[in-house]
A protein has these predicted regions:
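Alpha/beta enzyme core
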Residues: 1-142, 153-169
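Short Gly/Pro-enriched loop/turn and capping motifs at secondary-structure junctions
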Residues: 103, 147-152, 176-178
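Residues in flexible loops and secondary-structure boundaries
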Residues: 106, 150, 184-185
Length: 187
């Protein structure tokens, strides 16, 4: 448990050698763009990614906007989510996981650019496409979190939007595990 005033951060609990010992093909790391601890996290994953690359291990980065510089609506705003995906790509991720975004634009400066350049964010597929573009124009694998448990139709709609937008997959853990086994398997 941490206080509400503590910066959003993650603890490193294992290293690259631990991943190799366990037979893992990749290391994983969560960053929180927008957190006061963000730069520290970027430095930590940069060092771990370099070590992993030297040892032939891929890197997965969960890039979830949150923290002191991000509003609650901003955590899923398209400008913030696309930038978070881009940050993960810049940090060397082979695989990037981000949240599906809304059409909300958190940053006033970004709103002007999106409007002036006519960047399409009207549909979920368009927003996925924008996040893929932000991840080195599709030269990184980008998967999207499934979010809170929801109805089957909503899960399928998200999966179709990810497919249509050029994303590489949807992680639907809660949408599977919070159902009965027969329901989850049928889905």
């Amino acid at each position: 448990l941490m206080s509400d005033t503590a910066g959003k951060n993650q603890a490193i609990t294992a290293g690259v050698d631990d991943a190799l010992r366990l037979g893992c093909a990749a290391i994983g790391f969560t960053i929180y763009p927008g957190s006061d601890a963000g730069l520290e996290m970027f430095e930590e994953i940069s060092a771990m990614r370099a070590e992993a690359a030297a040892k032939g291990v891929a890197t997965v980065i969960w890039s979830y906007p949150r923290g002191e510089a991000v509003t609650k609506d901003g955590e899923t705003a398209i400008d913030v989510c696309a930038y978070s995906a881009h940050i993960a790509a810049l940090l060397g991720a082979h695989i990037i996981k981000v949240k599906l975004s809304t059409d909300h634009l958190m940053q006033p400066e970004a709103r002007k650019v999106y409007e002036d350049r006519g960047i399409d964010i009207a549909t979920q597929a368009a927003r996925v496409r924008h996040c893929v573009q932000a991840s080195f124009a599709g030269r990184r694998i980008i998967v999207f979190s499934g979010g809170a448990a929801k109805g089957e139709d909503a899960v399928y709609d998200d999966a179709r939007a990810i497919r249509d937008g050029g994303g590489n997959g949807s992680i639907i853990g809660r949408n599977s595990f919070q159902r009965s086994r027969p329901e989850a398997l049928a889905m």
